[in-house]
Structure formats: C-alpha cells, structure tokens
Amino acid sequence: MVPMTTLAPLGSGSDPDSFLRLGIPSKGRLSELATGLLNQAGLSFRRQNRGLFARVSGLPIDLIFLRTDDIPTLCAEGAIDMGITGSDLIEEAGANVEQRMAFGVGRCRLAFCVPDDEDYTDAAQLNGKRIATSFPHVTEQYLATKNAKAHLVSLSGSVEAMIRLGVADAIVDLVETGSTLAANRLRILEEIGHYETVLIQNGTHRCKEVADRLVSRLEGVVLARDYSLVEYNIPRSRVSEAEKITPGFNSPTINSLEDKDWCAVQVMVRRGEVVEVMERLKEIGASGIFEMTINNCRL
C-alpha cells in the first residue's frame, strides 16, 4: 500500500490524513460527469487553475484530479480512498477494488470490430492476426478463452483508424452508438463486455463514515434521475383506484383540500411511466395533474 503521507497536504488547518481522498478524472467527458454528480450531491469545491487538489466545503473530503485510467490503480494501492472511473478501466488494470455503486451513465460495450467487407463470424478467427486496442490485457484474456492469440498493438486512442492505416486487421474498442464504426466502415464482430461509470473504494475502508455518507448522497442523485414527482387532485371516492395507478414506494402522500370531497396526492413515479400514468389518472377523474423534477432524494 502507498502510505497516505506520500500525498502533499491539502488546504490548511485540519490534518489532511483525517480527510477522505476521492479521485476524479481531471479532464474530458467523465470529468464533467463526475463534477456534475458531486455538485448535485451537495459537494461544493473550487478547483483553481486546473490544479490537482481541491477541498470540499463542509465535509472532510479532499478531491484529487487524476488521469481516468490511473484511478483504479491508485485506489487499489491506497493513494486515494475512493474514485470515480469506468468499470472497463478497472478490468483492464486488474485493480483489486470494491465497487460501491454504479451511476447508470457512461454505458458502453467493449467489442471486437472488423471491416464491413470481411467475413469473420467469431473472434477465434482472429488467431494470429494484428489487433489494435487500448485494452490489451482484457483482449488477451478474452482471446485465451477462445484458445486464440493475436499480435496486440497497444494504443491510447484513435483505434478505429488503425485498420485503414494498415496497422491492424481488427480492433477492440469501446462502442456506444456505433456511429464511429459506421463512419469507418467497421462492424461489431463480438462483444467482450458491458461497462459504465462507477464509484470504487479500496479495502482499507479508511474514513468509513465519510465514505458511507458520500455513497448515500450519490445514491440519492442517481435515484432521483429515474423518478419524477407527480401531483394531482382526485375525488376522495376514487383514491383507492388512484393508489393502484400510483402506489408510490410505501404509500402516496395525501393532503386535504378546502373541498372535503377532494384531496391532493403527491407520489414518485418512474419517469418513463409518467405520461401513461397521467392519462390513466385523468380517466378516473383526476385533475390538476402535473410533473415535477426531483434533483435529489432519500428513500
């Protein structure tokens, strides 16, 4: 394990070793995503002049801005306590870390991709071929399950151009929408796995109370993204019918109105179901139905 004292003290005042060290990506889309999640979870901080460190206001958490692919290794070695990174990078690094939660964003597939006009049907057919990838470890392990071995060309980016440049016969790369593959006249031959953005922690469980509090806050943000708050008025005689449509987690919140024959209902509904729910409520006599965004919640 890397001693915690190897990192320079952050800020001033409190002992930095009593602060949880959270590694987040220093740049790129994942950096923006991580920063947004932390802000939504109520973590206020200021990164000055693209510095490497920032202290969270009001919580014993220090942020360390790192290369995304270094976060799994640094977490496993104890240089940081927790980190936000991609599950693909954890697997590639072979890092011994605990996944505390998945954020449900940054989802992608790691796949073998070949030219459209090649008739490969199985990754085993790439035995002895040249494969360009940013994931040599994962690629080699997967090929071994196929009793195959290839010449791996390790790159840090622009993998999809390597076949046209004559560097490789196939590539292993992350695929989201597939538009980049289509633009380069490539197709997916075989998928290796599915990955997403996750929060990880090492086995020391240092600053456990702070870590658990951070997880709770982030879980509230992630859960809120899946739900909306629906409010409506309903005749009291139809409340039982309405509850079947909008049962909520435990039960809906029901408030009295000036008209004693009516009541107001508040309930959380999955965002993908809101439109249908509103239509069904209207059919049984509900009125004043509207949807509100939830930014954070605890259940």
From Swiss-Prot:
This is ATP phosphoribosyltransferase. HAMAP family: HisG_Long. Its cofactor is Mg(2+). It comes from the Bacteria. InterPro entries: ATP-PRT_HisG_long, ATP_PRibTrfase_cat, ATP_PRibTrfase_CS, ATP_PRibTrfase_HisG, HisG_C, N-reg_PII-like_a/b, N-reg_PII/ATP_PRibTrfase_C. It catalyses: 1-(5-phospho-beta-D-ribosyl)-ATP + diphosphate = 5-phospho-alpha-D-ribose 1-diphosphate + ATP. Catalyzes the condensation of ATP and 5-phosphoribose 1-diphosphate to form N'-(5'-phosphoribosyl)-ATP (PR-ATP). Has a crucial role in the pathway because the rate of histidine biosynthesis seems to be controlled primarily by regulation of HisG enzymatic activity. Belongs to the ATP phosphoribosyltransferase family. Long subfamily. The keyword Phosphoprotein does not apply. It comes from Rhodopirellula baltica (strain DSM 10527 / NCIMB 13988 / SH1).
